[in-house]
Each structure stands twice: as C-alpha cells, then as structure tokens.
Amino acid sequence: MALLSLNNHQSHQRLTVNPPAQGVALTGRLRVPGDKSISHRALMLGAIATGETIIEGLLLGEDPRSTAHCFRAMGAEISELNSEKIIVQGRGLGQLQEPSTVLDAGNSGTTMRLMLGLLAGQKDCLFTVTGDDSLRHRPMSRVIQPLQQMGAKIWARSNGKFAPLAVQGSQLKPIHYHSPIASAQVKSCLLLAGLTTEGDTTVTEPALSRDHSERMLQAFGAKLTIDPVTHSVTVHGPAHLTGQRVVVPGDISSAAFWLVAASILPGSELLVENVGINPTRTGVLEVLAQMGADITPENERLVTGEPVADLRVRASHLQGCTFGGEIIPRLIDEIPILAVAAAFAEGTTRIEDAAELRVKESDRLAAIASELGKMGAKVTEFDDGLEIQGGSPLQGAEVDSLTDHRIAMALAIAALGSGGQTIINRAEAAAISYPEFFGTLGQVAQG
C-alpha cells in the first residue's frame, strides 16, 4: 500500500497517509521553496521601482501569484511565474495605473495588507480590492486605521473591518504610529505608504517582528532609520527606488515541517539546504532546541542581505516546554507544526500569547485542537494559546485542513508518526506556500 496517495474527492483533494507498522524514517537532502514573505516584497518593490528587477528563487505558490496578478493589473510588467528567474519592469514610485478590474488578493493577507499601503498614496486613482472567502473574513482594520491617520481614503465592509475594500488614492502625510501588536504586515504597510510622503513615517512595535521589508527597502534605495532598542523603524520620504537583483532564500516556515518530521520519526536524518535564518524568523529553531531537537546549521552565509544556512536535523527525543511573549512574532507561522512536535514530545507543552493565530487563514488554535484531537492528541485550547500533553501515541483519523496550508502540512507530518491510516481532506491547501510538499515528502520517506 502506498505511503501517500492524493486523490480528487468531490471538489477538493484528499490525501491518504498509510505509514507502515514498523514506522517511517526520512532521509536525504532537499530544498524548500523560496521564502513567501521575501517573494511578496520582491515583486512589490520591483513593481514600484524604476528599472528592471530580477528575482531568483521566487516562491511559485498561489500567494505570490496573487501579488503578481494584482500588480500586472496596475501596469507593472512581470514575467510568467514559471521559472527560476522572474523579471519585473517597474512603473516607478507613485506611478501605478488605475486598474480596469477588481484587484483580487486570493488567499493572501500579505498581498492585501501591504498593497493597501501603496494604493493609499496613488493620487487620483480608485481601487477595489477583494480576496477569497477566508481573506474576506480576516481583519483589515489594523492597517486601515493607521492609514486613515495618514489621510488615506479607504472604505471597508462591516464598519471598516473586512474586504472587499475601496481605496481612493490621495496625498498622504507622515505619522508616528505606535502599533498595539508586533506585526510585520502592519509595519510594512505603513513603511510602504510612507515612501510617497513628504517627511518621516515611523512605526514603533511592542516587540520585534520580521524585518524583511526594512532589509529590502534599503537594498532598493530607500532611506531608513532603525532603532532596535525601541523596536522603531522610520522611512524618510519621499523615496526613490531602483530595480535590483534579488535572490530569495528558502522559507524557514516551510523548512519547519521537515525539522519537526525528522525530529519525531526515529532513524531520520535530513539536510535542508539554503534556508533563510533571519534572526527575526528563527524562533522555531530556538523552541526546537529547547525541546531537545538535534539541528545543526552548516555553511552559514549571506545572500543579498539575508542570512542563509543548510540545516542538518537528526531524530531525537523531544521534551515539552513553555513558550510565549516576544518570541511569538518570530515563530507565529510555525506554531501548527510545533504543536505536532509537542504531541510527540514527552511531557507538557504550553503555548502562550498567540491569539493572533485566531485570525490567520483559519482559526489555527481551534484547528490544531480540533484536528490533532481527532488523532488522539491531548490538546487544551485557551483564548491565546494551547496546552498539549505529549507522549501518547496518535492514531490515524479523518481530518480536515480547513483550507489552511499550514494545517494541511502539519497534519501530514502528524499522520506519518501515527498508527493506522489518516485521511486529510482539502489537502490542496498546501499549494498556497509549498506546491511540491507532498511530492517531496514521498521522496524523502523513500530515502
């Protein structure tokens, strides 16, 4: 019987996982797709820069395709997303065209939130922005309200909370915004809006969030001042951006699935190559180390301003731990797979201060508790986190991704270490960030 089989079921795809009775080990080397956060930003900055931007290693998943689709509709020339090298002919800052159609961000919150910062400052242009059913229920007020403080004219459904959105571009004014949450999307949206203002736009956060926008904006020529002590970033407007060559490293959020899988499956050893290890993203490595994982960075290097390494991971005996606070923004997307690690660890793991997971592609706290619970995991759900009693064997079950890519992949890893058959409904969600995930899983499971 095949370890993995993917079949169409009604209007969705169903993944069946049949681990052998003796268990399965993962061996070999692999590369994960390009970093999703960096891919979005490279496309956007290329579109608003002057001249040509060449992007190598771009994630060819559904979310960056949504970004490319939106910016093509506003006049940017972006080559087809089907090769290792993508070429963007930029319009120049403030020169995006008014589109003749609705801008559809698909499932991508990053596309919608960051793009709003650019649209708000496109004078004399009207934009309508929407997304899929999931995105139309994710909160947009967190970027709309500070943009309105800058003078933006934005209308949103449900009293300013949700897409669809209408944006009337206007001249924005700089502000100093104290964000109530540490969010790279909020910060990036406002920095992009600040590019066209006359003066300094500053964003101060309660904790450090990922800094890909700051690194890339500086590479494209924007003038920024960064204060790591107060978690503040200032962009000095108006800016002039020039097209660049961008090499996108592998996505640590995608690598996390392999790091956990090889840790919990006895006899496993994987080398995950070319992974971005930006310190604003490495919370997952710190928590796994705290749990006793055997992960070694090799061949550390800098690639177009981003730290990169190959990560060697060997099977180990994990122990439960507690994490929360300032580390959460540095591993927010990895919590679903860390919950799987916790289910296979000895002892109790407690995840705190993670209420942001309730407004991701799904309510990820509820999804983890529900779907891992169906497999026999002992998960207690709190308003802002989870408690997981590890060490009890999981059993195969019929579960659902809830159309969330990270839930789909986390459940597949849990299924490999479970007894009996697992069926994952709506498994096609994985293609949002990792189109080759199931194929790669089949390869490394064969050794």
UniProtKB/Swiss-Prot annotation:
GO terms for biological process: amino acid biosynthetic process; aromatic amino acid family biosynthetic process; chorismate biosynthetic process. It is found in: Cytoplasm. Keywords: Amino-acid biosynthesis, Aromatic amino acid biosynthesis, Cytoplasm, Transferase. GO terms for molecular function: 3-phosphoshikimate 1-carboxyvinyltransferase activity. It is an enzyme of class 2 (transferase). Its EC number is 2.5.1.19. Its main location: cytoplasm. Phosphoenolpyruvate binds at K36, G109, R138, Q185, R364, R406. It catalyses: 3-phosphoshikimate + phosphoenolpyruvate = 5-O-(1-carboxyvinyl)-3-phosphoshikimate + phosphate. Gene3D superfamilies: Enolpyruvate transferase domain. Pathway: Metabolic intermediate biosynthesis; chorismate biosynthesis; chorismate from D-erythrose 4-phosphate and phosphoenolpyruvate: step 6/7. Catalyzes the transfer of the enolpyruvyl moiety of phosphoenolpyruvate (PEP) to the 5-hydroxyl of shikimate-3-phosphate (S3P) to produce enolpyruvyl shikimate-3-phosphate and inorganic phosphate. Monomer. PANTHER family: AROM/DEHYDROQUINATE SYNTHASE (PTHR21090), PENTAFUNCTIONAL AROM POLYPEPTIDE (PTHR21090:SF5). Belongs to the EPSP synthase family. This is 3-phosphoshikimate 1-carboxyvinyltransferase. The gene is aroA.
